[in-house]
Regions:
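Boundary regions of SH3-family modules and the immediately adjacent low-complexity/disordered segments
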Residues: 1-12, 19-27, 38-97, 110, ...
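Short alpha-helix capping/helix-loop boundary micro-motifs
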Residues: 22-31, 104-115, 260-269
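Short, well-ordered loop/turn sites that connect or cap secondary structure elements
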Residues: 30, 36, 119, 271-273, ...
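Loop/turn positions that initiate beta-strands
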Residues: 39, 119-128, 191, 274-275
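Asp-box/WD-like beta-propeller blade repeats and closely related beta-sheet repeat scaffolds
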Residues: 93-131
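Active-site nucleophilic cysteine motif
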Residues: 213, 217, 228-248
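...with weaker cross-activation on analogous glycine-rich loops/strands in unrelated enzymes
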Residues: 250-311
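Low-complexity, Gly/Ser/Thr/Pro-rich intrinsically disordered linker/tail segments
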Residues: 313-332
Length: 332
């Protein structure tokens, strides 16, 4: 029987291997591949201490997981809250998403409250109902439930509706394309995924969606580059682009390439529009229009989320990237 879990730390490291490091030509390096955020769901493919389908034994402290957006990896047991399918199905419609770069969960609905947890943009919290008189007494604050059973408070302005779907966590299987898994969970066709997201959140407007994706990406400007990162603490190139799309309701492939079975497909360079993805060898950026793009770069000169340009006349021009640009991807 399939098992499930919820990420129970503000930022959860997802490793590409059951061990946290590996030897490379450069020396010992991390095996980090991604990060899960508090409140997000995953499928547990192999329980801690079990043996994977490939015959790899896991330590009692490590689980093999697949995130709701299709990323496969390994997570420490103590970073997960294991739940039944019924419990997860009950949970998924409830959370709201945090939209600030960092949000404190406080013990009281006032700034002097004890800080219980510090969460990142993209983390999820469930708001608790309150009697009208209690809610009126602390207008501007929302009472929320933490995964460990405690309750706390955050500012109402920090919470927004979740635009992305996590239901693919139930239908993902080996050999099934991600779009097909999500479509199956929602009882629609894969071709309806993007149009339905636009209809639900942007009145069907492609232009509004493109604007929203670019605005989301710009919220990370100045964030440090972190290999495998996907939060305001540090983010990598594909973490930036996939997070911008996710927060706008469309789940794309997590890494820096176009993969069949996901919404992004290649289009001619001349057809690129703001919100499309630019692909370089091992790198991805988000096109902002007028020749400029935003990306998270590990280059020593910047080392984080910056804006650069495809235009040689622009002071933000990066010749090295322009020369290696090999594809433009779009969900339209």
């Amino acid at each position: 029987m399939m098992q499930y879990a919820i990420f129970a730390r503000p930022v959860v490291t997802i490793y590409d291997l059951p061990q946290t490091t590996k030897q490379s030509e450069a020396g010992l390096v991390s095996t980090i591949g991604d990060e899960g955020l508090y409140g997000q769901a995953c499928q547990v493919r192999t329980a801690p201490g079990g043996v994977t389908a490939e015959g790899v034994p896991l330590s009692p402290e490590v689980a093999e997981v697949v995130t709701f957006y299709g990323y496969h990896g390994f997570v420490r047991r103590d970073a997960l809250k294991f739940v039944s399918e019924d419990a997860l199905r009950d949970y998924l419609p409830r959370p709201l998403v945090l939209v600030g770069r960092a949000t404190d969960v406080l013990s009281l609905p006032k700034v002097q409250g004890v800080r219980m947890l510090e969460l990142e943009r993209g983390c999820l919290l469930c708001r608790l109902p309150e009697p009208p008189e209690e809610a009126l007494a602390h207008t501007g604050w929302a009472k929320v439930a933490l995964l460990d059973g405690r309750t706390g408070y955050v500012r109402e302005v920090a919470l927004e509706p979740v635009r992305f779907e996590m239901t693919a966590v139930f239908s993902q299987r080996e050999g099934l394309a991600f779009d097909d898994a999500l479509a199956k969970a929602r009882n629609i066709t894969a071709g309806e995924l993007v149009p339905q997201a636009l209809q639900a959140w942007y009145h069907g407007s492609e232009e509004a969606f493109r604007d929203a994706v670019c605005a989301q990406a710009k919220k990370y400007l100045g964030t440090e580059y972190r290999w495998g990162g996907k939060s305001g603490r540090g983010i990598d190139c594909s973490g930036l682009v996939s997070s911008a799309y996710m927060q706008c309701g469309v789940l794309i492939y997590r890494d820096a390439r176009i993969v069949e079975g996901w919404p992004v497909h290649q289009i001619p360079f001349a057809d690129k529009k703001r919100g499309d993805a630019l692909y370089f060898p091992g790198h991805i950026a988000l096109y902002l229009g007028e020749g400029r793009y935003i990306h998270s770069t590990g280059a020593s000169a910047s080392g984080g989320v910056v804006i650069n340009s495809l235009d040689p006349a622009d002071p933000l021009y990066r010749e090295d990237l322009v020369k290696s640009l090999y594809a433009v991807g779009s969900v339209f």
